[in-house]
Amino acid sequence: MNKLTKIGVSALCGSLASVAAANAGSMDVTGAASATYTSLSDTVVGNPLGMATSMTFTGNGELDNGSTFSVSIAHNNKAAYSSSSIALTTPSIGTFTYDEGGGTGIDRIDDMMPTAWEETWGTAVGTGIQTVSGVGGGMNINWTSTADMGGLSIHAAYSPQAKQGSGTNDKASSGVNATSMGSGYDIVLEHSGLMDGLNIFAGYSSIDQLTTGHTEGDRTATAAGATYAIGGATLGYQVSKDSLNVLAGVNHYDNQAYGVSFAVNDDLTLSYGVHKSKQNHTNSAKDAELEASSIQVSYSMGGATIKLAQTDVDHGAYDSSSATDRSGTTLVLSLAF
């Protein structure tokens, strides 16, 4: 990916380049644009043509003690911003990240299956699937261990008010929404040093939940799985559970996913994946299982990538009837700069 280093930034602020130089830092701008075509069977749709754009600002620098810092702000599809983070990496105790929307905690392993393009459920066909997110659903502080632990990585995230939105202004706090949730934490372990090509991962999340006439304990989530790469092929399997712990209604979700990808060469990749999710009610007669499967192909030509996905969804949005079953094809041309 080519970077537009400091060009766009100086256009935003003429004095920013001199400020960056004085602090031994830099600001880079990267972006992408995608043209899409989506066709759904057995579903009434509007115009199948679509477009997506993104722009990411990344700044970094170094302190006198050898610690480094970075900031990342992502803008997607005309949004004010989609995600942002401020990180401080120390030489000995790891990286501390102040994060909003960047996939921290257990959210980083909600779907780790190998793919040529997107998650099985993320190809614009629409599934309504519920995956684990933990405190990554709002502003949180994340710590990642140093890289010299024999292939073991530890990620810990904490939020003083989970799933309560974010304070995006200077010295501001988020608003309060109608939720009974309090503080929460996530812990994730990843290990890639046991054998060549093998990566195993596991995570746990717990969020304080006010015990009321509707709930009966804290909201918890777990996830575990592994991927194994051999030659150009990568295989993966994982399970996860999101426990809402309510007395009536949807009590928890049980998910399992598996997939395989194959890199034919440096430019062409193929994949097949399945993600199943069972919605469990306190009244088991209302239980429903959603299943999404997707065959994907991606082909890169320098800064351009063509992506194709054929996705089938059974019982979308956990509808036990066949009314929400759908099949769709998505074709994307992505241009990166």
What do these predicted ranges mean?
Residues 1-337:
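Outer-membrane beta-barrel proteins
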